[in-house]
Amino acid sequence: MALYLRSRALLVRNPELISDVHFYGNEYYDNSQCFPAMIAAVRNLNGELVTLHKTYLSPDGHKADVSAPKRLSRLPDDRTINGCAIQLGKPDQVLAVAEGLETALSVAIATGFPCWSCLNAHGLQTVEIPACVRTVFIFADKDRSQTGQKAAKTLQNRLAQQGVLACIVSVEDEIPESAKGIDWNDILRDKGPTAFPVMRPVH
């Protein structure tokens, strides 16, 4: 897992940040294949484990060469993924949110704020925020399809109705010609943590 995180420029100095993220050396992908895997707990707002997010890895620390290197475990019948997140850090009054796990880790490392991974655009729209949080920074993916940007705006509007200040933090760089989008992990890898804006909570 350390090799994979390093390949994504994710240098985690605070072990508590990834206390819900673990490495398994031999995880079943299907009936005939096993791979090393980075496995993260997906929890609801009450902190209850709902499912597991698995990233299958190659021995050299990259994503495994399979059709779906990222998967969620099957949900129990009495659970829903809506509102859940991989909770990287415990918020006080300020929380950052992002889509993918690597993006959320990038934000947490660069800004020092806890950042929850909502897994995807739908998860970003539906994530539930603790009552103690008064300011949310939404680190939006920048997609050609506008999916990430629209999800961020949907969350911002919902939080505003709840009396929570939500600020969208957008990637200003252009999307590379060969890519469908760009996110904050791309910024961290290309430019380092100093390329992130300085975030100050508003009280």
Model-flagged regions — what are they?
Residues D92-L95, L101-H203:
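TOPRIM fold recognition
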